[in-house]
């Protein structure tokens, strides 16, 4: 009586799907997955030497500049 059976969890799942819809749930799951991936990447970056960390930020800056140029060209 104290624990939930599989039927309780299935009913809760159906109610959640009806309330939020599948599109919002998949979007939320995708965002959660990318956040976990970024967190793991950040934890892995702690192991890199200080010289290597600067290289990633430079390539990120170049990517931002390239995206800004594409945005300007699109207008």
UniProtKB/Swiss-Prot annotation:
Keywords: Cell inner membrane, Cell membrane, Membrane, Protein transport, Translocation, Transmembrane, Transmembrane helix, Transport. It is found in: Cell inner membrane. Disulfide bonds: none annotated. Its main location: membrane. One of its GO terms (cellular component) is TAT protein transport complex. It is a single-pass membrane protein. It comes from the Bacteria. The keyword Transmembrane applies. Residues 41-75 are annotated as: Disordered. One of its GO terms (biological process) is protein transport by the Tat complex. The chain crosses the membrane at residues 1-21. It holds the Pfam family TatA_B_E. GO terms for molecular function: protein transmembrane transporter activity. The keyword Transferase does not apply. Part of the twin-arginine translocation (Tat) system that transports large folded proteins containing a characteristic twin-arginine motif in their signal peptide across membranes. TatA could form the protein-conducting channel of the Tat system. Belongs to the TatA/E family. The Tat system comprises two distinct complexes: a TatABC complex, containing multiple copies of TatA, TatB and TatC subunits, and a separate TatA complex, containing only TatA subunits. Substrates initially bind to the TatABC complex, which probably triggers association of the separate TatA complex to form the active translocon. This is Sec-independent protein translocase protein TatA. It comes from Xanthomonas campestris pv. campestris (strain ATCC 33913 / DSM 3586 / NCPPB 528 / LMG 568 / P 25).
